[in-house]
C-alpha cells in the first residue's frame, strides 16, 4: 500500500532562486488582489509599519499571503510539470 502512495506523489522541486521569484511574484499579486477586493482591509490588529504594508491589518495581510502561497504552489507545480524548473 505504501508503494502505491509513493507512485502518486508528485516529484518535488528543489528550492532555487527561480522558484523563490515565482513565489514572491505570486504573493505580490495576491496582496494586490486583496488590497483591491477586501472590503475593510484595516480592521483588526495593525501591522508594525502600516505605510509599508499599504494600511492593511494583520488579518488581511495573513489572508493575502496565505492566498499567495496557494497561488505560488500551483504555479511552481505547474511550471515544474511543464519542465521550466
UniProtKB/Swiss-Prot annotation:
It comes from the Bacteria. Coiled coil: none annotated. The keyword Cell membrane does not apply. InterPro entries: PSI_centre_PsaK_sf (IPR035982), PSI_PsaG/PsaK (IPR000549), PSI_PsaK (IPR017492), PSI_PsaK_bact (IPR037101). PROSITE patterns: PHOTOSYSTEM_I_PSAGK. Gene3D superfamilies: Photosystem I PsaK, reaction centre. One of its GO terms (biological process) is photosynthesis. One of its GO terms (cellular component) is photosystem I. This is Photosystem I reaction center subunit PsaK.
Amino acid at each position: 500500500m505504501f508503494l502505491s502512495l509513493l507512485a502518486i506523489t508528485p516529484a518535488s522541486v528543489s528550492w532555487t532562486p527561480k522558484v523563490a521569484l515565482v513565489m514572491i511574484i505570486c504573493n505580490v499579486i495576491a496582496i494586490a488582489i486583496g488590497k483591491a477586493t477586501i472590503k475593510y482591509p484595516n480592521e483588526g490588529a495593525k501591522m508594525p509599519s502600516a505605510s509599508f504594508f499599504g494600511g492593511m491589518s494583520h488579518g488581511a495581510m495573513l489572508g493575502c499571503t496565505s492566498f499567495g502561497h496557494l497561488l505560488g504552489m500551483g504555479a511552481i507545480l505547474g511550471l515544474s510539470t511543464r519542465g521550466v524548473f
